[in-house]
Amino acid sequence: MKIHEYQAKQLFRKYSIPVPEGLLCTNLQEVKTALKSLQLPIAVKAQIHAGGRGKGGGVKLGKTATEVVQYADDILGMSLVTAQTGPSGRTVSKILLEEGVSIARELYLSILVDRERACITIIACQDGGMNIEEVAASTPERIGKIHINPLIGPRSYHINQAREWLNIAQEQARAFSLFIHALYKLFLDYDCSMVEINPLIITEDNQLIALDAKVDTDSNALFRQRELQKMHDPAEDDPAEAEAAKFNLNYIKLSGNVGNMVNGAGLAMATMDIIKRAGAEPANFLDVGGSADAERIENGFRIILADTNVKAILINIFGGILRCDILAQGVVQAAAKVSLQVPVVIRMEGTNVKEGREILAKSGLSLINATDLNDAAEKISTLLTD
């Protein structure tokens, strides 16, 4: 789960991680009130769950009260488009006003779960304020990775490595060590998948301050994170993903043209590869799960069809706990309730596959059967090129 920058900084304050003084505002009256307690210049920062806000015009520095109010008026209610929002953008309903600070250097620092190495990794780079993915692609040698055994935690040599990567002076070693330990503790305490500071700044008087803050947490751990549950912002959820969650469907909306429905995350990933192989792009990730019933299949089908970008659908099921006849019943129910305007390719094997195929054959639906994954890829490719 993602939280807003202002919420991440609330957590930072709990762990004595330095952040600028700031106030959250949702309207111009609150902005005018905030100006009475904040010192100029003031940064006006849009609060949405996406990076690249500055490039999209969602972060402005006001040097006078008049400028701050004007920038706030411009940003509140705007549809902010960044590389992470897609062309439709996100509507800004909250802004963070923060006191400006004197910046001597901008750095990048993050702690994340490294799934390839099965450890926690500190990422350090001197190119702060930039898109770290762009730096990794163009100059990967500038990024330091310090791998930490989660059973042991960060040791002094780990922190020294990070400090050297960031070229932080020896005089700041103790402050930096306290900073890392606090950040790491926050990371563990809140079941985070990533904590990112971009930029981490060194001020002209040699203070370390988190100018920005991003905290992503493991949604599977939310049952024990009541504080984070309260930080969830439904307005930032994708409507289709929110609808899918009501039916316990693991759905992630993507930007492609082929919808897919699969049981099992691994098979879903393989199916997305097959779609790419066909020269198309997946429109979603949808794992209906092993215990799905006809109603859940129907709802998954309906959610896929609600995406106007979908030009074809690939259903790939290996019947086990989810029997093929149950899948077929769900598809038939869904087709009876929605207007099926796109071709559907079905590949299913496993438990009750014969019964499932009979149900589909008797339904009268114009469905395209595939014998295996390669056949499914060929049929999808043919459909999209005809």
Swiss-Prot record:
Pathway: Carbohydrate metabolism; tricarboxylic acid cycle; succinate from succinyl-CoA (ligase route): step 1/1. Keywords: ATP-binding, Ligase, Magnesium, Metal-binding, Nucleotide-binding, Tricarboxylic acid cycle. It is an enzyme of class 6 (ligase). Substrate binds at N263, G320, I321, L322. PROSITE patterns: ATP_GRASP, SUCCINYL_COA_LIG_3. GO terms for cellular component: cytosol; succinate-CoA ligase complex. Its cofactor is Mg(2+). Residues 9-243 form the ATP-grasp domain. ATP binds at K45, G52, R53, G54, E98, V101, E106. GO terms for biological process: succinyl-CoA metabolic process; tricarboxylic acid cycle. InterPro entries: ATP-grasp, ATP-grasp_succ-CoA_synth-type, ATP_grasp_subdomain_1, Succ-CoA_synthase_bsu_CS, SUCC_ACL_C, Succ_CoA_ligase-like_bsu, Succinyl-CoA_synth-like. Binds 1 Mg(2+) ion per subunit. It catalyses: succinate + ATP + CoA = succinyl-CoA + ADP + phosphate; GTP + succinate + CoA = succinyl-CoA + GDP + phosphate. Its EC number is 6.2.1.5. GO terms for molecular function: ATP binding; magnesium ion binding; succinate-CoA ligase (ADP-forming) activity; succinate-CoA ligase (GDP-forming) activity. It holds the Pfam family Ligase_CoA. Mg(2+) binds at N198, D212. Succinyl-CoA synthetase functions in the citric acid cycle (TCA), coupling the hydrolysis of succinyl-CoA to the synthesis of either ATP or GTP and thus represents the only step of substrate-level phosphorylation in the TCA. The beta subunit provides nucleotide specificity of the enzyme and binds the substrate succinate, while the binding sites for coenzyme A and phosphate are found in the alpha subunit. PANTHER family: SUCCINATE--COA LIGASE [GDP-FORMING] SUBUNIT BETA, MITOCHONDRIAL, SUCCINYL-COA SYNTHETASE BETA CHAIN. Heterotetramer of two alpha and two beta subunits. Belongs to the succinate/malate CoA ligase beta subunit family. This is Succinate--CoA ligase [ADP-forming] subunit beta.
